[in-house]
Structures are given as C-alpha cells and as structure tokens.
Regions:
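Short acidic/glycine- and proline-prone juxtamembrane loop motifs at membrane-interface regions
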Residues: 8-15
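Specific aromatic-rich, kink-prone transmembrane helix
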Residues: 16-33, 220-224
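Perimembrane helix-loop-helix junctions
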Residues: 28-31, 39, 62-95
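Membrane-interface helix-loop-helix junctions at transmembrane boundaries of multi-pass membrane enzymes
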Residues: 36, 77-87, 168-188
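Membrane-interface alpha helices of multi-pass inner-membrane proteins
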Residues: 41-57, 62-68
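Transmembrane helical bundles and short interhelical boundary loops of multi-pass, membrane-embedded
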Residues: 74-76, 98, 104, 109-121, ...
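Membrane-lumen/periplasm interface segments of multi-pass, membrane-embedded glycan/lipid transferases
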Residues: 81-93, 99-174, 229, 270, ...
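Transmembrane alpha-helix segments characteristic
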Residues: 177-201, 250-254
Length: 300
C-alpha cells in the first residue's frame, strides 16, 4: 500500500514511512540506551519526526501517540540519559510541530461545509456504522487501490492477517507487562482513533475515513511485536529448535482453511437461494424447492 501511495505522489506514503522510521528508532533507543549511540539515534528520531509531523493534518497526533507508546518500553533509570541526549532534537521537533499546527489552522484545512449527512448526528448510528466498517479499514491498510475499487486477492489479506496475528499473539504470550500494554493499546487505537477523529466531521462529510490514514501509527504494531519477540531468549530458543519448522506450516494451513471458507462464501453469495428471503423455521432445501417452483411458474 505504501508503494502504491508513493507511486501516486500521495503525502500519506511519506507519512507512513516516517512513522515506521520513528517507531523503529524510538523502540531501539528507549529500550536499550547506549551513550555511544544516543546522539545518532536522537538525530534519526528528529529527522523522522519532522518528516512525519509535516506530512498531513493528523500527523501531530500520530507523533504524540508514537512517542507515548515508545516511552512504555523506556528502560528503568534511563529517562535522564535519554533526555540529555535528545533534548535538542525534542526542541527542534516541537518547533516543527508548532509550525505544522499553525499552517493547518491558518489555511483552514480542517474547515468543512454545512451538514449534509444528518443521520450521523446520532452518536449511536455513527458508532454502529463505524464498527461495521472496521473490517474494511483493516483491508484498506493492507491494500485497496484506485478509488477504493480495486482489491487484492483474498489470500493476500488472509496471509497478512495471519502473519500479523501470529506475531501479536506470540508477543502477548511472552512479553512483559508494559510491552503487552503497548500492543493492546495499539489494537485498541485501531478502533477508537478513527471513531474519535471522524465524529466531529461525519455529519458534514459522511464516513470518509480510510484505513491507510491510520498506517503511520499502526505500522508500529507488527514492528513492536517483532521487537518484543526478538528480545526474548525463550523465543530465540524456540526459533532455533526443530519446532520452528511447524510455525510457518501451521500459519499456511490456517491461511488455506480461511481461503477455502472464503471460496465457499463467495460461491454461496452468487446463489439465488441466498438472495431470497428464507422464512424462520424453513430449511434451505425447502427454500431451494420454493425458488425452483417459482422460476418454473414464471417461465410458463
């Protein structure tokens, strides 16, 4: 998805790449401060954060969340040393953030017209509509192209979701308390953030949210999960054992099962029986017979 956005000259691509770079830099820096590397890390973090915050109007919020999430893994007793190494970078990024916010407010990029979607003034209706769209947002993070009219093959999404799910569940199993809090927090934000951010404009613009908007933050989920696993001795021992072979085998088997389920569902969705209303208590076989007899009568 990032490559597609970059090819279409979309600032979202730069924003996502900068978010990934900032996550990677801060996680390695905060978890293992090293006096010999702290200065270089602060420079990399400043460059990534500046590129992020200057990309789009939501970018300052992502900056705050990425820094806050990374602070959860800050090594105990390292706060002062990290601050000494990064205070100049923090000042520079703070100035860039203020400039970005001033530009956003000054040009009125967040201004919207009058109410055109009054049904979303109801919080209940809005929340239900957004929750029903969560699966669409997830697929859009992986890749839905064009004007949201070109999807990848189903097995592409199945493979991505299987791999990311495997990473996250494994990291939750072996991670420490603050590491688990980071992962659970990111999972929660994947649902809560769009709900909160879009609500003020939904009555005027409708449901305009796309999954890619959240990618600068959510690229941190597989990255953080992989970082947690790589830092655990138990996990490294498992990966070096004979059992490691069965992990991708099991993952591919699960993906294959999901693919078979998708094929069955897509075949059924084309069936005239599925499009017909099946009364309560009536079996599918009876519905098929009723549908067939109706078709015969219409052809006479």
């Amino acid at each position: 998805m990032v490559l597609f956005l970059a090819g279409s000259v979309n600032p979202n691509a730069l924003e996502i790449a900068a978010g990934f770079a900032l996550w990677a830099t801060l996680l390695s820096w905060f978890s293992r401060p090293d006096p010999e590397l702290d200065r270089a890390r602060s420079i990399r973090a400043a460059i990534a954060a500046t590129a992020l915050v200057m990309s789009r109007s939501l970018s300052p919020a992502f900056l705050v969340l990425i820094v806050g999430g990374s602070l959860l893994v800050l090594e105990r007793g390292a706060a002062r040393r990290v601050w000494r190494a990064g205070r100049i970078a923090a000042i520079v990024v703070g100035a860039m953030t203020i400039a970005a916010l001033a530009w956003t407010v000054g040009v009125g990029s967040l201004d919207t017209p009058g109410v055109s979607e009054p049904e979303y003034e109801s919080i209940k209706r809005y929340v239900v509509a957004m929750l029903l769209s969560v699966s669409d947002f997830e697929r859009q993070m992986i890749g839905v192209f064009g004007w949201l009219d070109t999807s990848a093959e189903p097995h592409v999404y199945n493979l991505w979701f299987t791999m990311i799910g495997f990473l996250v569940v494994s990291a939750l199993a072996v991670g420490a308390g603050r590491e688990r809090l980071l992962l659970v927090g990111l999972l929660a934000l994947s649902v809560v953030f769009p709900l909160v951010v879009q609500y003020p404009v939904a009555p005027r613009l409708g449901l305009i949210w796309q999954g890619r908007y959240l990618l600068p933050l959510m690229v941190g989920l597989p990255l953080a999960a992989g970082w947690v696993l790589a830092s655990k001795e138990r996990w490294n021992e498992l990966m070096s054992s004979r059992w490691a072979f069965w992990i991708p085998v099991g993952t591919l088997a699960a993906m294959r099962c999901q693919r078979a389920s998708d094929r069955r569902a897509s075949a059924e969705s084309a069936s005239p029986v599925d499009s017909a209303r099946i009364p309560p208590g009536e079996s599918r076989a009876n519905a098929s017979a009723t549908s067939a007899s109706g078709s015969t009568e219409c052809s006479r």
